[in-house]
Curated annotation (Swiss-Prot):
UniProt GO molecular function: aminomethyltransferase activity; transaminase activity
Transferase as UniProt keyword: yes
Subunit structure: The glycine cleavage system is composed of four proteins: P, T, L and H.
Protein's UniProt keywords contain Chaperone: no
Recorded superkingdom: Bacteria
Organism: Geobacillus sp. (strain WCH70)
Annotated GO CC locations: cytosol; glycine cleavage complex
Covalent S-S links between cysteines: none
InterPro entries according to UniProt: GCS_T (IPR006223), GCS_T_bac (IPR022903), GCST_C (IPR013977), GCV_T_N (IPR006222), GcvT/YgfZ/DmdA (IPR028896), GcvT/YgfZ_C (IPR029043), TrmE/GcvT_dom1 (IPR027266)
EC number assigned by the record: 2.1.2.10
This protein's name: Aminomethyltransferase
Keywords in alphabetical order: Aminotransferase, Transferase
Catalytic reaction list: N(6)-[(R)-S(8)-aminomethyldihydrolipoyl]-L-lysyl-[protein] + (6S)-5,6,7,8-tetrahydrofolate = N(6)-[(R)-dihydrolipoyl]-L-lysyl-[protein] + (6R)-5,10-methylene-5,6,7,8-tetrahydrofolate + NH4(+)
Family assignment from sequence similarity: Belongs to the GcvT family.
């Protein structure tokens, strides 16, 4: 039986096509991936991301605990701020990437990937020490993401809280949005400005409908996982299971900015990651653009001079750039800009070249 979010009941009304995504029955699209993608890049789109996991970490030793588990320096977080981090195994492979919200000293909220909820909880639970309480509240929380250049304008209609005061990677708790109490965070997974909004499960439908109603004039569309994927891909934001996995380290994936090997605390995987930061890695994640006609897809093999040098992690026809592009994890010696490589598509090796990432960056 597939898991469903509290918004499942209203999907049909908005014409959703659902798919099985990591054990969840979720909308891949409402109108079309292209239309939804375009809406987020130019106006705004609303996503149901209630499948994501939320854990509360509380107690006097919670900072010391998180410092041991996280690659980033959690001690740098101040109240009301958000931090991107990763958890790694001893060998540097990735357990998950996640967001850490600091509510107060000794009180944090972790937001993890849906497919990793059980694994992450067990991983954290297995390393608990001292005065730390770890609670999985994923079942109680719904999460909506309103993303795009007009996101603030739309959401502001529903609240008296000044949303412009919530800066990037900051949040405010207990905001009243059209009668619904929510945590509002200026974060997202699209490369655009926008908010991720956390509320109680039972308030999800009311919140969803009031945001779409408020955004009618601006052309806000309900959006599915298809557009979420093409948007995050263009912005070169990693997806666990593709750019990151137990076999791929954050350094290989180009996420060294979130790995603080110089922080005071020791963390799991530190030795390997420190070495990789200092000495480099044998393979690296790069952008590729097809020269020949073809679309690179996840898992396709990449070749150079007749030898296999890696594989595509994500690829698609970019709706914004109108080009066939991909992210590929390949041997470091082939990662210089404009290096010609080949992608094996349906048994044929087709020409591509290494290009700069991110593929898309919004004008500030």
């Amino acid at each position: 039986m597939l898991k469903r979010t509290p918004l499942f009941a209203v999907y049909e009304r908005y014409g959703a096509k659902t798919i099985d995504f990591g054990g969840w029955e979720l909308p891949v699209q409402f109108s079309s991936i292209k239309e939804e993608h375009e809406a987020v890049r130019t106006r705004a789109g609303l996503f149901d991301v209630s499948h994501m996991g939320e854990f509360v970490v509380k107690g006097d030793d919670s900072l010391a605990f998180l410092q041991k588990m996280m690659t980033n320096d959690v001690s740098k977080l101040t109240d009301g701020r958000v931090q991107y981090s990763l958890m790694c195994y001893e060998d540097g492979g990735t357990v998950d990437d996640l967001l850490i919200y600091k509510k107060a000293d000794g009180h944090y909220l972790l937001v993890v990937n849906a497919a990793n909820i059980e694994k992450d909880f067990e991983w954290l639970h297995g390393h608990l020490f001292g005065d730390v309480e770890l609670v999985n509240i994923s079942q109680e929380i719904a999460q909506l993401a309103l993303q795009g250049p007009l996101a603030e304008q739309v959401l502001q209609k529903l609240t008296n809280t000044d949303l412009s005061a919530i800066k990037f990677f900051s949040f405010q708790d207990d905001i009243n949005i059209n009668g619904v109490k929510a945590l509002v965070s200026r974060t997202g997974y699209t490369g655009e400005d926008g908010f991720e909004i956390y509320c109680r499960r039972e308030d999800a439908v009311a919140l969803w409908e009031s945001i779409l109603e408020a955004g009618k004039e601006e052309g806000v569309l309900p959006c599915g996982l298809g557009a979420r994927d093409t948007l995050r891909f263009e912005a070169t934001l990693p997806l666990y299971g593709q750019e990151l996995s137990k076999d791929i380290t954050p350094i290989e994936a180009g996420l060294g900015f979130a790995v603080k090997t110089n922080k005071d605390a020791d963390f799991i995987g530190k030795d390997v990651l420190k070495k990789q930061k200092e000495e480099g890695t044998a393979r690296k994640l790069v952008g590729i653009e097809m020269i020949d006609k073809g679309i690179p897809r996840h898992g396709y093999k990449v070749f150079a001079n007749g030898e296999e040098i890696g594989f595509v992690t994500t690829g698609t026809q970019s709706p914004t750039l109108k080009k066939n592009i991909g992210l590929a994890l390949i041997k470091t010696e082939f990662t210089e800009m404009d290096t010609e490589v080949e992608v094996e598509i349906r048994g044929k090796r087709l020409k591509a070249k290494v290009i700069a990432t991110p593929f898309y960056k919004r004008a500030k």
